[in-house]
């Protein structure tokens, strides 16, 4: 090929790439700016249940162009519903929450359905409905959702039931997939908020995977198309969460639905919703699901994904799991009269109420030592700071704990508030650990599993407190503190 021809081809592909990028930017700007008008207001937390989405499905029955049919039932008898719309030739199947405690995409699905059923004029919506035949199966595991737990009532992981089909939920997913023979499938999950993008301190807010369909991890047209759409979504999400997209491990799992759906001929795309700074209920990540899924549908409807090279798929950084909620670096710690310098990794575990509708956090010390290859949502350089065990404060009669007086007590070395206090289901709203009248402080030492509550001093002055795993600067008003707990 002559130099002139090569130059011409480069110019053509460069212009084509610029055109695609410009179209994508315009589309995403539109989707983001309009999101709030389509967001389903009744869903605003992770712990949603079948009874929360049932009235939304009933409302959608009255919308023109929407077909709803019950395609199965869970073990406990909750309905599994398929919502279909669009008249196009390209069939797309989206399902969510096969793990009951992974609800971010379920919320996004109802945002997307509001987008599609809105009466206001929208050229993007019209194009998608004309080109695509869309099928949504939200909350595949409603029994697990009722308890906010991963597995179903049978106690199995539905995502490891693609071969045995022991569960009615797994049977339903297989039957629907086969009846649709969908061109594309979106397998929508949540992952731990402690995943980061490899070798960075950034959380893997969204992770993608085009699952392998064999141990060799071969790439055929079906899997290649899934990779192309993922590359498109990755470039889009980078605009809103730069460096916070990961690539899920693609080792073949012969029992998993995603891997088998890829094998059965549907281009399977796994989307995992991870963590995002100060977004415990994952509402920002929900928005990213909404935008990226609709943009992906647009790329399929216009077939623009076909112009994307799969080489960029491998360039998406892999997931790693090296995040803590709080990382303290190089703090000085006195043990048996000898000073040690070490790092601390602390995570916040969620403790649910009886109805699995609310929670408080109970922190745990999960790692100690050299944590230089780990990161934190919040990190403090503790060089020069010394760990100070806290004292118990006995309040005066009628004295009530508040945030303000707790800060004053922390500065004096008190960490524990003695007295009868009823703990709300979302925990105590003042930054001291409550203890009973007969509570005895054990000898202070760090160990894995400890609920970390202590003070930090510098040059003899107490400057910071760690209460139930939350770091509090005692001389600043801002803090990530969420709740303390009652220690018995």
Task: Give the location of each predicted region.
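Active-site/substrate-binding loop(s) of hydrolase catalytic cores
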Residues: 89-91, 98, 103-243, 262
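Surface-exposed patches in mature extracellular/periplasmic domains of secreted proteins
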Residues: 68-72, 121-126, 244-250
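Short beta-strand/turn micro-motifs at beta-sheet edges
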Residues: 77, 123, 257-260
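C-terminal accessory segments enriched in acidic
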Residues: 3, 22-47, 180, 209-218, ...
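Active-site-proximal beta-strand/loop segments in catalytic clefts of secreted hydrolases
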Residues: 71-73, 85, 96, 137-141, ...
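Bacterial Sec-dependent N-terminal signal peptides
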Residues: 1-26
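Acidic/His- and Gly-rich active-site-bordering loop/insert found
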Residues: 75-100
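Short glycine- and acidic-rich boundary segments immediately preceding or forming the N-terminal edge
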Residues: 24-79
